Structure formats: C-alpha cells, structure tokens
Amino acid sequence: MKKILMMLLLSLSISASCFAAGAAGRFSAEEKAADALVAALTGGEATYAQVSKNFSKALKEKLTAENFKTVQDGVKKQIGTIKNTNLVLLNKQYDLQKGYSGVDELVYFGTVSRDKFARIFVSFVEENGAPKVTAFQVSPIEPQKNAPAKK
C-alpha cells in the first residue's frame, strides 16, 4: 500500500511540475524584458534599441527613441534617481466570466531616498507567441506620516 501511495504521489508531483513549466517560461521572458526596461528608466546602461525589442507594435509606434529619452529625463527630474529596484508582484488579469485575459502585470518598487520610493508598473500581452510590453508607469510613493500617539 505504501508503494502504491508513493507512486501516486510521485506521478502527481511530476505532472504538476510539467504544467508549471509553460507559465515559468513566460514569466522568465517577462521578467527579463521588465528588468531591462526598469534598468533603462532608472538610469542604467540599457538603450532604446535594446529595450524596444520587447515593446508591442502599438507601443513602438507611440514611443520613439526621442520620446523614450524624454520619459527617462522626466522620471529623473520628477522622481529622482531610483535605486535598489525589486520585483514585488506578478498579477495575471483574470475575469470570472471570461477567464484569463492574456495580460500580465509586473510591479517593481525602488528606493529614491530614505523616505521616498517609486513604483514601476509594466504591463505585458502575448504578441506573435512572445510577451511584449504594452504599457509602463513610474510613480512616486511617499509613506504616510503618522501623528505621534497621545498619552
């Protein structure tokens, strides 16, 4: 009986890992593309040519190299230099009636200063079999200051 249960458990674990392989591959590609974009937005060495190969067709039409440079300068001017960015959330858009919409969102947080942070949002959709960036947003976050407790 123990052998039968062990074989059943082993076969279930193998099949579960096989189903996860497809999602892991897509997530890995999205994470690479988002990391390159985040690096370019936060003052890294990535160029528009390197980053734009992961853009969707519609985003490439809207966001030229000149516009991208303006966005980079705007981020630096309005938010500051963002350091220590970390992926904190992968969100898959799911509708209860329609199911998975094919849109994935990756959210990064970065440190600007001791009490100022930045949230970087990158949205993906699958285009020609590969995940492509459809939108991104960088917004500042400042923690709420709590009043001292009354005694």
Where would I find each of the regions flagged by the language model?
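Positively charged n-region of N-terminal signal peptides that target proteins for export
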Residues: 1-4
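Short solvent-exposed beta->alpha transition segments
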Residues: 49-99
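Bacterial N-terminal signal peptides
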Residues: 7-16
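Exposed beta-sheet edge and beta->alpha loop/turn motif
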Residues: 91-151
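Short, low-complexity N-terminal intrinsically disordered segments enriched in polar/charged residues
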Residues: 19-43
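Residue-level signal for cytosolic alpha-helical hairpin/rod architecture
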Residues: 31-35, 52, 56, 117
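Long beta-sheet-rich domains in secretory-pathway and surface-associated proteins
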Residues: 43-44, 106
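Low-complexity, Gly/Pro
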Residues: 20-23, 46-49, 53, 70, ...
